[in-house]
């Protein structure tokens, strides 16, 4: 069994520029291993993700050798015509004439209201009727109750893209299990994003790794995370943002679904990880464009987590923090406008965490 899809978001870079040679190599390795499903979005990497699809995938491989999914940034449109303009831009960037799967991006309560206002679900249906999208759906970041409401009103969609990983499975904020079960109730197949939680489950405390080694010592921490998501029966695709050939090879290996006993062991690792993680940030970056003070929120939270795991390393961590503040607002620059919190898929209390960052890392 292998349900792995290639998420074109966390692509390899050299000096902040995409490394197209490396992307070609990873793309080719994924296809050679039997992979077919590629996922991108209008807003990923400021449009460079879709451009990379066109350059590294569509221009180099036959169209029938892969499936391509992209997403409408419906939160940025102001009319139905805007939906068409954005969609046509995406086709051009990706170098294709249709998408196998086309989704509304990042539905929460606010963005769902916009989708209703601008008839974005009708737009998805029109694309399907014209053969420009074979399947439709949406990516989702809100409660199971709202998801139930959306799927009841719009049963014509085929997929829901959910954040699912073993750390968030029972989370009250993310509601991964409840949202998954809502999709099952409505007969919708699930595509998984963030199976490794933005990479944070690739590097876990030694105590958690020792627990996971009891399940399979040959698997890396990231491998265990991907296996968990692939083991869910109603999951059709598990997206992984791979940036090395080694990651492709491990993730594309044949996977045996987890047993109930293995799931129980994994929950023991969850307790260890949660106890060692101060801020549960995935570094998705959705907060950044809303911050009026240009605060490097994900970078600061990563440093703060490192500090909290070993405060004695502050002599190594604070210089890195200070160097970031030369180009970005410091944690102390926060004015508590909470625009970041309103756009955080993880529902983090970002303002409070920034106060903790300030107290730990500033003026050392």
What are the roles of these predicted feature ranges?
Residues 259-278, 294-332, 337-341, 347-364:
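Ferredoxin-type iron-sulfur electron-transfer modules in oxidoreductases and energy-metabolism complexes
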Residues 22, 107-282, 286, 290-295, ...:
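Beta/alpha (TIM)-barrel catalytic core signal, keyed to glycine-rich beta->alpha loops juxtaposed to Asp/Glu
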Residues 1-66, 123, 129:
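N-terminal binding-site loop/beta-alpha segment at the start of enzyme catalytic domains
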Residues 2, 36, 97-100, 134, ...:
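Short acidic/polar active-site loop segments enriched in Thr and Asp
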Residues 48-59, 80-91, 95, 112-122, ...:
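Distinct, well-ordered alpha-helical segments
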Residues 39-40, 70, 192:
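Hydrophobic residues in well-ordered beta-strands that form the structural core
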Residues 64-76, 102-105:
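A short, structured active-site edge motif that brings together acidic residues
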Residues 9-21, 71-81, 110-113, 209-217:
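Active-site mouth loops of central-metabolism enzymes
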